[in-house]
Amino acid sequence: RLVGSEMCIRDRAGSTFPDDCNIEIHGKTLQYVSRGGLKLEKAMKHFDITMDGKVCMDIGASTGGFTDCMLQNGAKKVYAVDVGYGQFAWKLRQDERVVCMEKTNIRYVTPNDIDDELDFASVDVSFISLTKVLGPARALLKDGGEMVCLIKPQFEAGREKVGKKGVVRDKSVHEEVVNNIISFALSNGFSVLDLEYSPIKGPEGNIEYLVHIKKTDDPIKEESVDIHSVVEAAHGELDRK
């Protein structure tokens, strides 16, 4: 969005202005407290997921974009988990449907730490592999509970495969990373239902992927899950932006 002050235009967060200046906001404002909500919004539409009446967990909540999206789509309760502190949006902190769990590492959260079995959980974490998160998250889900996870190649590929500024551009590495995560999920009690790419890139320009999984004792990978096609489509669309 654009902020105007005495004919000056600012389009970046963190700009400062005199106390007595007139400020106008122009342009379309974001529907959620952060752009993370756009990722879950696409996942819900593409994977045909509903939030109505569900108890959810937002793992890697940060500002709370995913939490906001869940609530706006009818979630009954959201546990917002993040190792950080002070980032979570004020309006969400005040929402009685939200349990804010800051300074909390999901790897050490057990069913005894929450009051409910989860119907749904999302994962959007950085500087840690999904392989460290899926096991603890599974223990919190009810049987048949579902998850949408962001697969981030920059945090899954080996250091030798990560380029400048932490960006992974090689499509073959993307396919390898996604395949590894899917294989891990299948080996650890999750069916893999669908795969799509995130509608927005990560902060440094990394393409990321959304995977839809389900807790089960008999894991399967749906035949419609086509890693190569999704990676190709992601690069075809997002590399132009």
Report each predicted region and the residues it spans.
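Conserved SAM-binding loop of SAM-dependent methyltransferases across substrates and taxa
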Residues: T63-G74
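A short glycine-rich, Lys/Arg-flanked "PGG" loop and its adjoining helix->strand segment in the class I
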Residues: T131-E146
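Short beta-strand element of Class I
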Residues: K76-Y79
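Conserved class I S-adenosyl-L-methionine
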Residues: D52-S62
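S-adenosyl-L-methionine
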Residues: V81-I128, K132
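Short, glycine-/aromatic-enriched active-site segment of Class I SAM-dependent methyltransferases
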Residues: P153-R169
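Short, small-residue-biased leader/transition segments that mark boundaries at the very start
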Residues: L2-I9
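Flexible, glycine-/basic-rich loop-and-beta segments that form/coincide
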Residues: I207-K241
